[in-house]
Amino acid sequence: MEKVVIVDAVRTPMGRSKGGAFRQVRAEDLSAHLMRSLLSRNTALDAREIDDIYWGCVQQALEQGFNVARNAALLAEIPVSVPATTVNRLCGSSMQALHDAARAIMVGDANVCLIGGVEHMGHVPMNHGVDFHPGLSRTIAKAAGMMGLTAEMLARMHNISREMQDQFAARSHQRAYHATQSGAFRHEIVPTAGHDADGALQRFDYDEVIRPDTTIDSLAALKPAFDPVNGTVTAGSSSALSDGASAMLIMSESRAASLGLPVRARIRAMAVVGCDPSIMGYGPVPATKLALKRAGLSLADIGIFELNEAFAAQTLPCIKDLGLLEQLDEKVNLNGGAIALGHPLGCSGARISTTLINLMESRDAQFGVATMCIGLGQGIATVFERA
């Protein structure tokens, strides 16, 4: 079976969904911009050699409808002979895009793929057109469709206090701000055109969503967002609403060698699991364990972890049950996470994988894991190995 390698990985800055930098930029343009960027950064690859494009997106309606992957590829002027498909596994969509492309390469159905994802939550809100089947109430709790309440459930089950959540949320903003100031994100962000507060067109090269003035005290003043009477989850300890895209160039190891392209990482193992929809945020735990089993590795072998921070109340139980609380500041979300950067649904899987690979390089880590929870009770994980 062919080994799958990551040749390059990029993302746009994360724009604030409400009146933010990308308020006049469409999802297809964010995606096409990254497709063009990957090709311009890797000139040894002829675009005609791309076998397929896999692009994650959750709300496939309006500008994100009618196969946004193909629309973006056409905008990017990728040859019409290159096919493209849009992938939806809710929050794990662009990581699923990576898995689908990797499997195609492993079995010889492809040699070169572009993968990525996009979500413009300002233009296409996550509740746009949602219409759950009423019969689901017979098989799952009604709250399973309300992500904030699933986080509240996990907090109660795992004794995660409001104070712990606020502390973790403040950490996310502080670390993301430090990563911005130190230039750590420069290796992954492709400057992207947007509009400033006055409507002037400019190129953004920083994440707009980070709040550097966030403190535990300022978070403590916020009211519960989902359970007003007994809740502990607030807007401040939840992932921000943001717009963005992410992308990777992946190929077989043999094709990368023949093109003379540097290899940044290999895919060691992949996994997707299901779990109780009422505690959907717990999915990273069984997904990570299964991926590590397939990789023949243990938790102790992993140098860096990236967990998507849907909620602090969701992330902390996962960190706790993976035995990582004592190593939090050495191994987990070292540049912050979705609480600070936002969680543009279809973008996030490739985004956290991109951040992970950059951290593995800067920290000289051999192995890393990127993992996410998924609405309605799933988890997804990928084990990466430095080349």
Curated annotation (Swiss-Prot):
Give yes or no: UniProt keyword Transferase: yes
This chain's function reads: Catalyzes the final step of fatty acid oxidation in which acetyl-CoA is released and the CoA ester of a fatty acid two carbons shorter is formed.
Q: What is its EC number?
A: 2.3.1.16
Q: Which organism is it from?
A: Pectobacterium atrosepticum (strain SCRI 1043 / ATCC BAA-672) (Erwinia carotovora subsp. atroseptica)
Q: Which domain of life is it from?
A: Bacteria
Does Lipid metabolism show up as a keyword for this record? yes
What positions does UniProt annotate as the active site of this protein? Answer: C91 (acyl-thioester intermediate), H343 (proton acceptor), C373 (proton acceptor)
Q: What GO MF terms are annotated? A: acetyl-CoA C-acyltransferase activity
The record's family statement is:
Belongs to the thiolase-like superfamily. Thiolase family.
Q: Which gene encodes it?
A: fadA
The subcellular localization recorded is: Cytoplasm
Catalytic function, reaction form: an acyl-CoA + acetyl-CoA = a 3-oxoacyl-CoA + CoA
Instruction: Name the GO cellular-component terms.
Output: cytoplasm
On assembly, the entry states:
Heterotetramer of two alpha chains (FadB) and two beta chains (FadA).
Mainly localized where? cytoplasm
Give one Pfam family, short name only: Thiolase_C
Put simply, this protein is called 3-ketoacyl-CoA thiolase
An example GO BP is: phenylacetate catabolic process
Q: Which NCBIfam families match?
A: AcCoA-C-Actrans, fadA, PRK08947.1
Pathways per UniProt: Lipid metabolism; fatty acid beta-oxidation
Against InterPro entries, the record matches this protein to: FadA, Thiolase, Thiolase-like, Thiolase-like_sf_Thiolase, Thiolase_acyl_enz_int_AS, Thiolase_AS, Thiolase_C, Thiolase_CS
Q: Which UniProt keywords apply?
A: Acyltransferase, Cytoplasm, Fatty acid metabolism, Lipid degradation, Lipid metabolism, Transferase
CDD domains listed in its UniProt record = thiolase
